[in-house]
Amino acid sequence: MSIILGIDPGSRITGYGVIRQVGRQLTYLGSGCIRTKVDDLPSRLKLIYAGVTEIITQFQPDYFAIEQVFMAKNADSALKLGQARGVAIVAAVNQELPVFEYAARQVKQTVVGIGSAEKSQVQHMVRTLLKLPANPQADAADALAIAITHCHVSQNVMQMSESRLNLARGRLR
C-alpha cells in the first residue's frame, strides 16, 4: 500500500490530490486547492509551503509527485511557476518524501490516452478512474491525475524490474 500526493503547482492556485494505491486499485483520499489571495510573491510562496506541509502532515504520503515546468510564452509566469514548484518540493523534501516529476503531456497521455487532452477530459477521466460522484475542480483534478500517473509509472517500473530480475535469474542457472 502506498499513499501518493500529487501537486499541480501555481503561484495563485496550487492543486493537490491524494490517493492510495493497493496493487492496481486506486482510492481517492482527498483533494483541493491552496489559494493564495495576497499580492506579493514571497507571501504567496510562504502560503504554498505552509499549505503543502499541512497536507503532508494530514495525509502522511509515501510519495510526492509534481508536474514539471513547461515553457510558457510569458517568462515572468514561468519564473513564478518555477518558484511555486520549488517551495512545494522543499516542503516534501523537508518531510523526507521522495519527489517524482512528470510532464503535463505524460500525465494527459496516462490518464486520458491523448497527450494533448483538454482540462475537461482530464477531469472526466479522473472522476471515472477514482469513482468520484462529480468532477473535481480543474487544479485538483490535475493534481489527482499527476498522482495517478505516478501509480502507473511506478507499477510499470516494478514490473520491468521484476521481469529483468527473473531474466537474470534464468541466465544464472
Curated annotation (Swiss-Prot):
Alphabetical list of CDD domains matching this protein: RuvC
Keywords: Cytoplasm, DNA damage, DNA recombination, DNA repair, DNA-binding, Endonuclease, Hydrolase, Magnesium, Metal-binding, Nuclease
Binding site for Mg(2+) 2: 67
Cofactors (names): Mg(2+)
Subcellular location, record wording: Cytoplasm
Reactions it catalyzes: Endonucleolytic cleavage at a junction such as a reciprocal single-stranded crossover between two homologous DNA duplexes (Holliday junction)
InterPro entries assigned to the protein according to its UniProt record, in alphabetical order: RNaseH-like_sf, RNaseH_sf, X-over_junc_endoDNase_Mg_BS, X-over_junc_endoDNase_RuvC
Residues given in the record as Mg(2+) 1 binding sites: 8, 139
GO CC annotation, single: Holliday junction resolvase complex
Pfam families: RuvC (PF02075)
GO biological process, alphabetically ordered: DNA recombination; DNA repair
Catalytic residues identified in the record: 8, 67, 139
Enzyme kind, highest EC tier: hydrolase
UniProt GO molecular function: crossover junction DNA endonuclease activity; DNA binding; magnesium ion binding
Co-factor binding comment: Binds 2 Mg(2+) ion per subunit.
Assigned EC number: 3.1.21.10
Entry-linked PANTHER family: CROSSOVER JUNCTION ENDODEOXYRIBONUCLEASE RUVC
Family: Belongs to the RuvC family.
Function recorded in the entry: The RuvA-RuvB-RuvC complex processes Holliday junction (HJ) DNA during genetic recombination and DNA repair. Endonuclease that resolves HJ intermediates. Cleaves cruciform DNA by making single-stranded nicks across the HJ at symmetrical positions within the homologous arms, yielding a 5'-phosphate and a 3'-hydroxyl group; requires a central core of homology in the junction. The consensus cleavage sequence is 5'-(A/T)TT(C/G)-3'. Cleavage occurs on the 3'-side of the TT dinucleotide at the point of strand exchange.
NCBIfam families: PRK00039.2-1 (NF000711), ruvC (TIGR00228)
Quaternary structure and interacting proteins, as annotated: Homodimer which binds Holliday junction (HJ) DNA. The HJ becomes 2-fold symmetrical on binding to RuvC with unstacked arms; it has a different conformation from HJ DNA in complex with RuvA. In the full resolvosome a probable DNA-RuvA(4)-RuvB(12)-RuvC(2) complex forms which resolves the HJ.
Protein name: Crossover junction endodeoxyribonuclease RuvC
Encoding gene per record: ruvC
